[in-house]
């Protein structure tokens, strides 16, 4: 493919490439907010104590672009900074001029907030494909009291 066309209606290919890969799409707004994270013991959840989140990992497959927002309480950028981390699908050693790469892997985002006081949101306004597979978290669970 000759390159990425933003508002074009045609594309051209080089003579030596008989089967080019072409990405065509309409930009759309994607937003997914994860629910509150908690620890489960069997069929019950453990709601007592404090679950201090450290990292959040999102598994993706053949994805081109997305952003992850970590919004601690209060959820307003004027009162507390909203942390944003961007995934572009580009890795060192895999970049070629005029070629859009899709990547598969795990995207890690630092959180460092109590699980009850944070919103974790995945956003995308790109025409590139986005395929989220799963999400995991790393956290400390501190129980305040326990029956003996």
Show the residue positions of the predicted features.
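Beta-sheet repeat architectures centered on beta-propellers
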Residues: 1-148
């Amino acid at each position: 493919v000759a390159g990425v066309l933003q508002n074009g209606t045609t594309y051209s290919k080089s003579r030596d490439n008989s089967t080019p890969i072409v990405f065509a799409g309409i930009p759309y707004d994607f937003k997914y907010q994860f629910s509150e994270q908690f620890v489960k013991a069997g069929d019950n959840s453990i709601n007592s104590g404090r679950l201090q989140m450290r990292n959040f990992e999102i598994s993706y497959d053949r994805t081109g672009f997305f952003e992850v927002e970590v919004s601690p309480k209060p959820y307003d950028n004027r009162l507390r900074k909203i942390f944003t981390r961007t995934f572009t699908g580009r890795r060192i050693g895999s970049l070629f001029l005029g070629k859009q790469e899709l990547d598969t892997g795990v995207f890690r985002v630092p959180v460092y907030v109590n699980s009850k006081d944070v919103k974790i949101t995945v956003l995308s306004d790109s025409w590139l494909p986005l395929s989220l597979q799963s999400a995991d978290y790393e956290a400390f669970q501190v129980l305040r009291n326990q029956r003996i």
